[in-house]
UniProtKB/Swiss-Prot annotation:
Example GO molecular function: transmembrane transporter activity
Family per record: Belongs to the major facilitator superfamily.
Places the protein is found: Presynapse; Cytoplasmic vesicle, Secretory vesicle, Synaptic vesicle membrane
Modification type Phosphotyrosine: residues: 480
Protein name in UniProt: Synaptic vesicle glycoprotein 2A
NCBIfam families found in the cross-reference section: synapt_SV2
Free-text function comment from the UniProt entry: Plays a role in the control of regulated secretion in neural and endocrine cells, enhancing selectively low-frequency neurotransmission. Positively regulates vesicle fusion by maintaining the readily releasable pool of secretory vesicles.
Keywords: Cell projection, Cytoplasmic vesicle, Glycoprotein, Membrane, Neurotransmitter transport, Phosphoprotein, Synapse, Transmembrane, Transmembrane helix, Transport
């Protein structure tokens, strides 16, 4: 028995030695071959190596990427399978063999020479005699990328457009809808939250800007990571961060913690736009890309409509609240914040059913995973179209040469946090290097011009869209002030005031032995008045002040008449007992003004629907650049009419007009950005440009709102000049219509 075992072991060792020698000679012959493509994209025939004219004992296999073109060669080479018993590192079983995945002839782990050097043209290997992997020229890498782009486009056409893309459309639409909701949340809750959190004007301003700052950080962070870790994975993480901190923000009581939660919520949702557009574009064929990316933009509008409708339906219902002592209050506006997290939560659940982008897999040398995803796309669409018998004929997909960038650490090296720290630093270095490559010689001009277009459009758009509601509120305040009633020189004695006084000015009045019980004062001013032996009890006030008044022997019991409401006034022998608890600041709370904010936002977001439809239908017909420049010019012209907006209704109409014509330029800009950068830089560049967009939004909002109530002469020229500059820069960018995705 032992002798038989030894003979068998010796036989196996001998067979392995022979196999190694055969592989060594075959590899030497293959290295001399030419890595070429034979009419790959018109005849769907891909040939990896040319045969030599001399003695060719091992004919090169036909590496065509469709089934049936290399069947004979595969049958001839079937006896030389690597799946042999007792195989070692040089004879590994192909890792996808047991999953039914076609073997990738470039990029496979098992394709090595006997001395350990990779084959020519294989991922990480030599190419056309250029030397070691680190010496591969950028021209060769660009050639590989162009070949992959053409091949990938042909495969997407075979997969078709159908149920899979529409399912992904609605899933990613939820993520984009969550971004649209996030922009409006803080603006809608401020009229109610300012009372609960006792917010000053500076606090409210910071709360309004913190969301944009968070989205700016998130866009750059998640955009860079998505090119290294994957679109789906980073989108799941970013949406999870958004939903978790949006949920927490609805329960926290203090201003600081609420501000922190909204900041991190903005960081989470910041990754939505750059990842969603890049992710969806990599499942769309060239003839469908512009149109369907434009349809996807509609979900941002739907998010704004959803937020406005929920605010209108929830916030005014004060009964939807509860209180635990005087320290914890949960009012209806917190319910609204909670409801606004639903799109993000639903997007997370739906996204778990979707695969990663196959283009990302191919860019990272993961042929097997990419093939399985593309097969899933093909089979899903064919079944939905009633052709389940159609077979996915792709057998080989080209992968890009990969450089060794990751730092591997053995599990027994250092502590776990040291290993994670090194990996995090390595990943951060890769992300930063990828970002800097966007400013390399090949993409520097495009990136700088895109920065100009994104900045100018965002500066004018966000600045004007926030300036519009502020101008409407200013016009409302002017109209309200014009209806103020003035009561000069009145003398009142022994009268009990137990009703509401609103929008009144009392000048030079004298009040003796009067009682103010259960009185509500709203926008009331007492000037140069005398109060002697009066009694104030259970008085609530807003925007009420006593200027240059004198109080003698007067008692204030359970009122909210705090010290700052007495401007240059004298109090002689007057007493304050049991002042009301709560915010000592003067806030307006909810009311007609809050309803107007919801209504204006609802109309403004709904007004972009026609622009969305037109841009989707014409995007692939007239091109991205014409759409972008034309919409920007129309927006610039619409700014001219702002000078004639002197009433509330006129300003609302102009807001709808501006939003309707400017949305097409945003859609075109999103589609253009996706097509200008290659797949390994797409989300990084998109994230950086979107972060710049949020920075411009902060600057635009700060500058434009400072002119509210002063003049319209400054904001309108600013916006018009920015839009004109952006449209002129856009015309100098390359057109991406009719081009395959890089």
């Amino acid at each position: 028995m032992e002798e038989g075992f030894r003979d068998r072991a010796a036989f196996i060792r001998g067979a392995k030695d022979i196999a190694k020698e055969v592989k060594k000679h075959a590899a030497k012959k293959v290295v001399k071959g030419l890595d070429r493509v034979q009419d790959e994209y018109s005849r769907r025939s891909y040939s990896r190596f040319e045969e030599e004219d001399d003695d060719d004992d091992f004919p090169a296999p036909s590496d065509s990427y469709y089934r049936g073109e290399g069947t004979q060669d595969e049958e001839e080479g079937g006896a030389s399978s690597d799946a042999t018993e007792g195989h070692d590192e040089d004879d590994e079983i192909y890792e996808g063999e047991y999953q039914g995945i076609p073997r990738a002839e470039s990029g496979g782990k098992g394709e090595r020479m006997a001395d350990g050097a990779p084959l020519a043209g294989v991922r990480g290997g030599l190419s056309d005699g250029e030397g070691p992997p680190g010496g591969r020229g950028e021209a060769q890498r660009r050639k590989e990328r162009e070949e992959l782009a053409q091949q990938y486009e042909a495969i997407l056409r075979e997969c078709g457009h159908g149920r899979f893309q529409w399912t992904l459309y609605f899933v990613l639409g939820l993520a984009l809808m969550a971004d649209g909701v996030e922009v409006f949340v803080v603006g809608f809750v401020l009229p109610s939250a300012e009372k609960d959190m006792c917010l000053s004007d500076s606090n409210k301003g910071m709360l309004g800007l913190i969301v944009y700052l968070g989205m700016m950080v998130g866009a750059f962070l998640w955009g860079g990571l998505a090119d290294r870790l994957g679109r789906r994975q980073c989108l799941l993480i970013s949406l999870s961060v958004n939903s978790v901190f949006a949920f927490f923000s609805s329960f926290v009581q203090g201003y600081g913690t609420f501000l922190f939660c909204r900041l991190l919520s903005g960081v989470g949702i910041g990754g939505s736009i750059p990842i969603v557009f890049s992710y969806f574009s990599e499942f769309l064929a060239q003839e469908k890309r512009g149109e369907h990316l434009s349809w996807l933009c509609m979900f941002w509008m739907i998010g704004g409509v959803y937020a406005a409708a929920m605010a209108w339906a929830i916030i005014p219902h004060y009964g939807w609240s509860f209180q635990m002592g005087s320290a914890y209050q949960f009012h209806s506006w917190r319910v609204f914040v909670l409801v606004c997290a639903f799109p993000s939560v639903f997007a997370i659940g739906a996204l778990t059913t979707q695969p990663e982008s196959p283009r990302f897999f191919l860019e990272n040398g993961k042929h097997d995973e990419a093939w399985m995803v593309l097969k899933q796309v093909h089979d899903t669409n064919m079944r939905a179209k009633g052709h389940p018998e159609r077979v996915f004929s792709v057998t080989h997909i080209k992968t890009i040469h990969q450089e060794d960038e990751l730092i591997e650490i053995q599990s027994d090296t250092g502590t776990w946090y040291q290993r994670w720290g090194v990996r995090a630093l390595s990943l951060g270095g890769q992300v930063w290097g990828n970002f800097l490559s966007c400013f390399g010689p090949e993409y520097r001009r495009i990136t700088l011009m895109m920065m100009g277009v994104w900045f100018t459009m965002s500066f004018s758009y966000y600045g004007l869209t926030v300036w519009f509601p502020d101008m409407i509120r200013h016009l409302q305040a002017v109209d309200y002030a014009s209806r103020t009633k003035v009561f000069p020189g009145e003398r009142v004695e022994h009268v009990t005031f137990n009703f509401t006084l609103e929008n009144q000015i009392h000048r030079g009045g004298q009040y003796f032995n009067d009682k103010f019980i259960g009185l509500r004062l709203k926008s009331v001013s007492f000037e140069d008045s005398l109060f002697e032996e009066c009694y104030f009890e259970d008085v609530t006030s807003s925007n009420t002040f006593f200027r240059n008044c004198t109080f003698i022997n007067t008692v204030f019991y359970n009122t909210d008449l705090f010290e700052y409401k007495f401007v240059n006034s004298r109090l002689v022998n007057s007493t304050f007992l049991h002042n009301k608890e709560g915010c000592p600041l003067d806030v307006t709370g909810t009311g007609e003004g809050a309803y107007m904010v919801y209504f204006v936002s609802f109309l403004g977001t709904l007004a972009v629907l026609p622009g969305n439809i037109v841009s989707a239908l014409l995007m692939d017909k007239i091109g991205r650049l014409r759409m972008l420049a034309g919409s920007s010019v129309m927006s610039c012209v619409s700014c001219f009419f702002l000078s004639f907006g002197n009433s509330e209704s006129a300003m609302i109409a102009l807001l709808c007009l501006f939003g309707g014509v400017s949305i097409a330029s945003w859609n075109a800009l999103d589609v253009l950005t996706v097509g200008l950068y290659p797949s390994d830089k797409r989300t990084t560049a998109f994230g950086f440009l979107n972060a710049l967009c949020k920075l411009a939004a902060v600057l635009g909002i700060s500058i434009f709102t400072s002119f509210v109530g002063i003049t319209k002469a400054a904001p309108i020229p600013f916006a018009s000049a920015a839009l004109a500059l952006g449209s002129s820069l856009a015309l100098k960018l390359p057109e991406t219509r009719g081009q395959v995705l890089q």
